[in-house]
Amino acid sequence: MYEGINLITAIITPFTVNDEIDYESLEKLIEHLLNHGSQGFVIAGTTGESPTLSFEEKVELTRFIAKQVGNRALLIANAGSNNTKESVEAAKALSKIEHINGILAVTPYYNKPSQAGMIAHFKAIADASEKPVMLYNIPGRTVVGLTVDSVIELAQHPNINAIKETTSTEFVEAEVEGATGFAVYTGEDAMTLSAYTVGGAGTISVASHLYGDEMSELFSAMNAGNWREAGRLQRYLTPRMNALFAYPSPTPVKTKLAEKGFVREAVRLPLIPLSDAEKLHLNELLEK
């Protein structure tokens, strides 16, 4: 399923002046991303502002993207939350949508469950989903995180086949070593080269909204064994990747996409657009 899929974009959700999903802008953005290296999309994930999307909006958004993209890219729909029952119902609904290839589920935030609780949570989602589940380990946002041992245990489930791992290259390496036939993606753009060199499958990216061509070149260089060129590209990209998280994401990437005419800067509360001073600072970081 993930063979040859290196660059997956965690796509933003654009909004109109009335705070509705801007499907016209989204349609144009999708085509742009497909033409600039994106081989897949995570729909309504963190970058897609999932916490402020209703369940109905998530279903509608997923259907729209799935219909437009069809079989041109891998599509992962986000069903995760800190409520297992709600996640199960979301997985059931989203996995039935045509052209959806997989379901993303995040470690439960705020509740602070044990490892055993998280394992039970993910197994319940996987049991309910009609499509394979990708785990999402991001303790920087959720407080709790899966251990390598828990990931390896979950990888034995017949309907769990991948993880978006944001912790460290060491975690990526250990999961690759311990889980056969299990795709390990980094969720940190700046770890693209290091994660790939230890056996990672690729990157689930925010930066690919703006630097898709360069990231595609990076993967091409690595796949060709041209490590000096890969290193050069990663050195160029890393400060720009980090700059996109200088303020609450996805605000910076939406700001830059708005400058290019793809979307409005709009984000949903409690996120707010960047101030003029913050925009100036962001541009300084991106130009270093």
Swiss-Prot record:
It is an enzyme of class 4 (lyase). Pathway: Amino-acid biosynthesis; L-lysine biosynthesis via DAP pathway; (S)-tetrahydrodipicolinate from L-aspartate: step 3/4. SUPFAM superfamilies: Aldolase (SSF51569). The active site is at residues 136, 164. GO terms for biological process: diaminopimelate biosynthetic process; lysine biosynthetic process via diaminopimelate. Homotetramer; dimer of dimers. HAMAP family: DapA. Belongs to the DapA family. This is 4-hydroxy-tetrahydrodipicolinate synthase. It comes from Leuconostoc mesenteroides subsp. mesenteroides (strain ATCC 8293 / DSM 20343 / BCRC 11652 / CCM 1803 / JCM 6124 / NCDO 523 / NBRC 100496 / NCIMB 8023 / NCTC 12954 / NRRL B-1118 / 37Y). The lineage of its organism: Bacteria, Bacillati, Bacillota, Bacilli, Lactobacillales. The gene is dapA.
